[in-house]
């Protein structure tokens, strides 16, 4: 396991942006598998590989680049370290970024599932508030720890490992009828 971590560290050092994006996409896919198998209990025969691929695509093309880029911007807006800085970053993340990100995520997943603009709007009206409230139960504490203890280039990976559970929830929320 330590050897895998060292290899990941080397790759991250050589290609930080690419590795962060691949990590995010892969872990969004893992979250979807968990959603389908544990939350929805679809079994192997009922598992939608197409859905998992779509969710991974969202991870590669949206989650990885957007969240990774956001962390870089956040470090420029609020430079430094320490508890007060971590708290400020968490507050800005949760007040400004999380609501927009969540709405975009649900909209993109719905569009990839073939919903019309009107249907996407209905889904957002039905599911967005609940998803945002659930976000606030989980992410403030995670983000304070992330911003206080974790270096910039590891933040996306740390968040995505914690987010395996969150991604399972989001996949379920985004794909339920």
Swiss-Prot record:
One of its GO terms (biological process) is regulation of mitochondrial DNA metabolic process. GO terms for cellular component: cytoplasm; mitochondrial inner membrane; mitochondrion. InterPro entries: Mpv17_PMP22 (IPR007248). One of its GO terms (molecular function) is channel activity. It is found in: Mitochondrion inner membrane. Keywords: Membrane, Mitochondrion, Mitochondrion inner membrane, Transmembrane, Transmembrane helix. It is a multi-pass membrane protein. The chain crosses the membrane at residues 11-31, 55-75, 95-115, 132-152. Involved in mitochondrial homeostasis, and control of oxidative phosphorylation and mitochondrial DNA (mtDNA) maintenance. Non-selective channel that modulates the membrane potential under normal conditions and oxidative stress. This is Mitochondrial inner membrane protein Mpv17. The lineage of its organism: Eukaryota, Metazoa, Chordata, Craniata, Vertebrata. The gene is mpv17.
